[in-house]
Amino acid sequence: MDFTQLDDFAFAYYGLPDQSSLVSLVDQTHTFQSPTAFPQHQAMSGLAHSGLPFGTLPTGNRSQSMEGSKAPPDRTSPASNALEDSTTDEFGLASRNRADGTDLGVKPKEDKADATAAWSGLRTKAGKERRRLPLACIACRRKKIRCSGEKPACEHCLCSYIPCVYKVTTRKAGPRTDYMAMLDKRPKRMEERVIKAISKLDEEVASSVTCPVVKSAIPGTVPSSKPTKKRSAEEAFGPDLETWAKVPSEPKIEGDDGSSSLQVQGKEGNKLQQEGTEALPSQEIQEHLAELFFDNICGQSYHLLHKPSYMRKLKNGTLPPVLVLTVCAVAARFTSSPLVNSSRPEFLRGEEWASHARDICTRRYECPNLTILTCLLILGLHEFGTCQGGRSWALSGQAIRMAFALQLHKDLEYDPSGRNGTKTQLSFIDREIRRRIMWACFLMDRFNSFETDRPMFIREDTIELPLPVKEKYFQFDMPAPTEMLDGRVPHPPSPKDGQIADTRENMGVAAFLIRAIALWGRIITYLSQGCKDLDPNPLWEDKSHYMKHLNDIVNLEASLPLSLKYSAENLEVHKTEKTPSQFLLMHLCLQHNILFVSRAAMSARKQHGVHVDFFSEASKRTFNAANRISELLREAEQSGCFVSAPFAGYCAFSSTTVHILGIMSRNPSMKLTAQANLTTNVKYLHKMKKYWGMFHWMVENVRTQYRNVLDAMRAGANVEERATQPSFLQYGDWFNRYPRGLFDAEFMDPATHKRKDSGADGVLEAKPELRSVEEYFTLPTPRRVENKDTIRAAAPKRKQSAKKQTGMPAQPGQHLDSLQIIEPDAVSQEHKFSGGLGLQITGVAGFNPLAASKTQIPDFSTTMSPMSPANMTPFAQHAHTHTFFPPELLAMNFGQGSNGNTDPLDRQLIYGGYLMDASTGLGDGYTWAL
């Protein structure tokens, strides 16, 4: 037979080497019959092998459609592997039962009842055996007949030789509406029906007019002809959301996720552990300065660092270098070691280490951590001592923001910076360190904000922390509950804990010092920041805020435990615990609060309705508090304790202003007491100015106040009126006095202002460069320096002439004659001010204070001021002059005044050194016992 006549036939799998495998495949897939049921297939297999090459298939059938060709629709289906039946077989081979469908791989009709369906092995979502066909093909659905469900072709499609296609849908099989959602919608539907019915009744009542009105029906009243069938949100969008969730994520940008940021912080932390190593001093100096830090800084200014942990890490070399540099910088001012000693003043010795630490902290302002925060606090104190007002103010603000960012104002049990959601429980030492750092920020805010234009940032109610425990509990890791700032107990002790039940006994010097400074902050807000003017009641009324603050001061001192009340025995106990300076500082602050409030009451002396008893009591409290401060300083000196906190120096300064007025009293006992106490205070202030630069200004202010009071007494002025002036020197005024610190190592006068940058006011309104006629005559003409070399050459000549005059033997009136450049106005006032700067109250002649106040001012206007707050020995060139004040001021000998004359340099320092009226700082607030 010629095979070329079989063009319209397509035989599947002609090139198969073994038909038995094909038969076995059909059996396993559909009928599970033995290969012996198809003998004709084996015969045809042999012909197929002989007629066509191995692996070749006719190409004519590929171009035909599935419907137009008699070939099976799918070559991959089991039905395409079987040959045609005998009606279309031109080979004449006999076949048995070829029309029953067994050659197509389906079960015979007689076996339909016994065989199981192909989809019977499937399971439902609930896990039960499936009994119904899950999905019919398109052809069976169209003809509304039962589909057998075989894939890829069902029985009906195979018999009809039509393509069998199953519709693929992404919608999950399930009910169209959720049953619970339907129940939820029922009340809403009933409510809508009731509203519609009520609206219809209202319309019928309103339409009483007989004329026809054509109007449209109310939306919703007419039933819609088309039923609305809506799917639930889960049914409609569930598959899409599931598909969107399974989409692989896009490549992440570097640094976009939280883990990368944590890795960056980890790298910064590792870098922080190494940065600054090259600037560290030797190990011996580090340990020496660390001991000085814990003796003079920690516990007095701020309560920072745990000494056992710090010293252990310092010896092991595991501390961050920036922290070591900061501690060395602030402690270097207290050392006398030749390894640290330098030609610079004591308060500038650690500036080199501070500059390195400051640069490291500035580069890490966006990564808050406890190490950087502690360094900012200590550096702010160091800049405070070097007269860097603006820098100290900025560092304090940065530290406060960082403390709140670290959640230090909350008493947390777990570390909030735990990575990957892990919670690390904090130990007692770590929790106490966090509390003390936050309280240090609170104290720094009170110290730096003591001025009218610098309000406080931290409110008392924002700190939800207990006060620090006793120092020995902190050092030896002994947990103990304490009170909060307002007196509440956040964690009451239980008998099972084994802790001390009395929370007040657990509170040491640090806790009550914080309460004293907090009360001082409230007093500042009332007196200096406008709250006094808002008080509806006068000061002497019981309902006034002034009386409330006064009662708070008295109650705070009365609430001290017995171990914290001042006595010689308690001072010795604190010396054994190495906390005597803290103990003395706390009592200095308590007495200063009394002095500050009582002195402020003198400003209302001339108000209408003032009681005399009110001022007499205020005067008594003021003088007693000033005397008590001097007694504490004297006892500290006798016991070998040095209170090095800067605020203690301001307490001494406030006490000194009261003693200056006490010296002028007509009461002999008050006068003698004031003389002795003034001597103690002046010695202490001179000792403090070695370590804190701003006390140079305070010492000179005290000297100016003293001599101005003498001048006023000689001029016949009423000292009582001067004593009641409302303005006085404040602790925060040094910010304006030294906004940028010392300008160079030669100690230029810090009062000289830095030249303003031309672009500093670029965003403000343009100022005209021309001046009016009035400004031309009233304002000074700017000086033009044409020959700078001549001026520079003249300066050494003036210095040489000054040295020659200094080296000459002093004779009566010689200094006065050499320095007097008397103007006509000064001559006219000579008889009025017959007294000079000598300390004799009467009988002093031959000296003109106005002349002394104007001597050599032109010389010092272009050169360095003779008195600078950085100059440690301003009177070193006078061998006969005391290094503190003139001998007369310390000896308080009013009978001897060195012929009423003082050294020329001293007169220049007092009257020409500062351009300010020091009379406003005269210890106001004291009335005299005449």
UniProtKB/Swiss-Prot annotation:
GO CC terms in record: nucleus
CDD domains for the chain: fungal_TF_MHR (cd12148), GAL4 (cd00067)
Signal peptide: none
Domain of life of the native organism: Eukaryota
Keywords of the record: DNA-binding, Metal-binding, Nucleus, Transcription, Transcription regulation, Virulence, Zinc
SMART domains linked to this entry: Fungal_trans (SM00906), GAL4 (SM00066)
SUPFAM superfamilies tied to this protein: Zn2/Cys6 DNA-binding domain
Chief place of localization: nucleus
Family annotation (Gene3D superfamilies): Zn(2)-C6 fungal-type DNA-binding domain
Transmembrane segment boundaries: none
GO aspect biological process, one term: DNA-templated transcription
Residues within the DNA-binding region(s): 137-164
Compartment(s): Nucleus
Expression induction or repression: Exclusively expressed during infection of common bean.
Molecular function as annotated in GO: DNA binding; DNA-binding transcription factor activity, RNA polymerase II-specific; zinc ion binding
Note: Multiple copies of the gene are present in highly virulent fusarium oxysporum strains.
PANTHER family from the UniProt entry: ZN(II)2CYS6 TRANSCRIPTION FACTOR (EUROFUNG), ZN(II)2CYS6 TRANSCRIPTION FACTOR (EUROFUNG)-RELATED
Protein role: Zn(2)-C6 fungal-type transcription factor that has a role in the establishment of the fungus within the plant and/or the progress of the disease. Regulates the expression of virulence factors such as SIX1 and SIX6.
Protein name per its UniProtKB record: Zn(2)-C6 fungal-type transcription factor FTF1c
Originating organism: Fusarium oxysporum f. sp. lycopersici (strain 4287 / CBS 123668 / FGSC 9935 / NRRL 34936) (Fusarium vascular wilt of tomato)
